[in-house]
């Protein structure tokens, strides 16, 4: 390991001890915002410190085995060879693990997120596929122990959704789900197709982190137009008799958010404001990213929602992720919620890109 990296790790261990002390300070405990920020930092530093301690222990084992190789006793030298080999591998493996822990993290990775699914080209078939994507994400969330809450939905008469917005709550949610942003194309034979022809349709998915209140963009109330209306279900029939649904328009940007899933107008308004905050923050982040003109390929899709990231081919039972040239003939499993089959290779590729960028900087 490079001495500069080792020194950086020792600084992080010092900071970990400092944060640990601050968290038990009554002044910190009484300041909820500060306590929350330090708790988050503690969790990240705890992981690094723990692995760094393992590294130092593995280094000690390696040094001991190295000394044993120089022993006068041939039996001792023979025994030391295996220990030396194991210790050398352990040092290399833990060094790799530390390298990944030291990669720059997206500060939003631990946040909850909003997922918007919209039916695109393909009419009813696209809406049905939007419903399939919602089911796939719901099953995946269930496996991960995450909680899903539908914020707004516009059902299609033939089944599925013209659009749906959900909130996903859980640990490390945005860090996983952000790779789902982009265009999702489906190829299959619709139930109404008598000739057995394969049709192509598409949906777009947008994933945005939930913005904590402390970090939220300040929105001027004068910039908002708030409308109330009756919540409606599939086909437009009214499902309640009060104007509990909310539509908020942010006049300067033209961003419109609707929420009608809750019976309470107050709850729908709070949810709509959360989604609006996330959309405005996303627009600001995308503007900053495009100005930076990063040379690194980005596996998280940009604001161009038409950018196709994945194809689901049902006749062949195939799913292809175009960003990393991944093809899997396990479509049924993936649609049933085994999304880790796709997510893990994408996250690994993203880590590899970051490591390559880090190597270039050094």
From Swiss-Prot:
Lyase is among the record's keywords: no
Residue positions, PTM N5-methylglutamine: 237
SMART domains: PCRF
Gene3D superfamilies with a match to the protein in the record: 3.30.160.20, 3.30.70.1660, 6.10.140.1950
Family indicated by similarity: Belongs to the prokaryotic/mitochondrial release factor family.
Function: Peptide chain release factor 1 directs the termination of translation in response to the peptide chain termination codons UAG and UAA.
Compositionally biased region (Basic and acidic residues): 282-296
Cross-referenced PROSITE patterns: RF_PROK_I (PS00745)
GO cellular component: cytoplasm
Pfam family, one: RF-1
Protein name, entry field: Peptide chain release factor 1
Modified how: Methylated by PrmC. Methylation increases the termination efficiency of RF1.
Keywords: Cytoplasm, Methylation, Protein biosynthesis
InterPro entries: PCRF (IPR005139), Pep_chain_release_fac_I (IPR000352), Pep_chain_release_fac_I_sf (IPR045853), Prokaryotic/Mito_RF (IPR050057), RF-1 (IPR004373)
Major location (coarse): cytoplasm
Record localization: Cytoplasm
Region Disordered, annotated ranges: 279-305
Gene coding for it: prfA
């Amino acid at each position: 390991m490079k001495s500069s990296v080792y020194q950086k790790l020792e600084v992080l261990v010092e900071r970990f001890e400092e944060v640990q002390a601050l968290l038990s300070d009554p002044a910190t405990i009484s300041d909820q915002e500060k306590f929350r920020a330090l708790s988050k930092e503690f969790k990240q530093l705890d992981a690094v410190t723990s692995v760094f301690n393992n590294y130092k222990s593995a280094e000690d084992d390696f040094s001991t085995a190295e000394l044993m190789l120089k022993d006068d006793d041939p039996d001792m030298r023979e025994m030391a060879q295996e220990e030396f080999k194991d210790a050398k591998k352990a040092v290399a493996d833990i060094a790799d693990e530390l390298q990944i822990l030291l990669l720059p993290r997206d500060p939003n990775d631990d946040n909850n997120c909003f997922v918007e699914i919209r039916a695109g080209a393909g009419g009813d078939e696209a809406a049905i596929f939007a419903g399939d994507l919602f089911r796939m994400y719901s099953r995946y969330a269930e496996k991960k122990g995450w909680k899903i809450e539908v914020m707004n939905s516009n059902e299609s008469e033939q089944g599925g959704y013209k659009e749906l917005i959900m909130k996903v709550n859980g640990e490390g949610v945005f860090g996983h789900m952000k790779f789902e942003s982009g265009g999702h194309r489906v190829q299959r034979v619709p139930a109404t197709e008598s000739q057995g022809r394969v049709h192509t349709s598409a949906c777009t998915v947008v994933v945005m982190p939930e913005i904590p209140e402390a970090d939220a963009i300040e929105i001027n109330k004068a910039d908002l137009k708030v409308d109330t209306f009756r919540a409606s279900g599939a086909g437009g029939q009214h499902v309640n008799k009060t104007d509990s649904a909310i539509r908020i328009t942010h006049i300067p940007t033209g961003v419109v958010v609707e929420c009608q899933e809750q019976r309470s107008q107050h709850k729908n308004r709070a949810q709509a404001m959360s989604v609006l905050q996330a959309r405005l923050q996303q627009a600001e982040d995308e503007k900053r990213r495009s100005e930076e003109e990063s040379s690194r390929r980005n596996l998280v899709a940009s604001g161009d929602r038409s950018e196709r990231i994945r194809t689901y081919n049902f006749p062949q039972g195939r799913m292809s992720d175009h960003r990393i040239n991944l093809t899997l003939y396990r479509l049924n499993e993936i649609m049933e919620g085994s999304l880790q089959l796709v997510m893990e290779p994408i996250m690994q590729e993203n880590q590899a890109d970051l490591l390559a960028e880090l190597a270039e900087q050094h």
